[in-house]
C-alpha cells in the first residue's frame, strides 16, 4: 500500500525544474504571467521556483491538466 501513496505523491508534487518546464510549455515567460493566470501572488511563484516552498498539489494538478489539454489541441 505504501507504493500507492508514493505514486500519488509523485503525481501531485512538482519540482522547481518541472514548474519551469510547465511555464515554458504553457507559454508563461514571467512569474507574474503565471501568477496572474492561476490567481496567486508573484512572490508565491518565486518561492516555488526557488524551492523554498513546495508547489501546492492543486496548482501542480492544474498545470498538468493544462499541459495535457494543450497537447490534445495541438
Predicted regions and their residues:
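Short alpha-helical "recognition helix" segments of helix-turn-helix
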Residues: 33-35
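DNA major-groove recognition helix of helix-turn-helix/homeodomain DNA-binding modules
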Residues: 57-74
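Recognition helix of helix-turn-helix/homeodomain-like DNA-binding domains
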Residues: 39-54
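Helix-turn-helix DNA-binding elements, focusing on the entry/boundary residues of the two helices
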Residues: 30-31, 42
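A short, Lys/Arg-rich alpha-helix, primarily the initiator
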Residues: 2-27, 64
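Short intrinsically disordered terminal tails
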Residues: 1-6, 70-74
Amino acid at each position: 500500500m505504501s507504493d500507492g501513496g508514493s505514486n500519488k505523491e509523485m503525481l501531485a508534487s512538482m519540482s522547481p525544474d518541472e514548474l519551469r518546464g510547465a511555464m515554458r510549455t504553457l507559454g508563461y515567460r514571467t512569474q507574474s504571467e503565471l501568477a496572474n493566470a492561476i490567481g496567486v501572488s508573484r512572490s508565491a511563484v518565486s518561492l516555488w521556483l526557488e524551492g523554498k516552498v513546495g508547489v501546492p498539489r492543486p496548482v501542480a494538478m492544474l498545470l498538468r491538466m493544462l499541459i495535457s489539454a494543450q497537447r490534445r489541441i495541438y
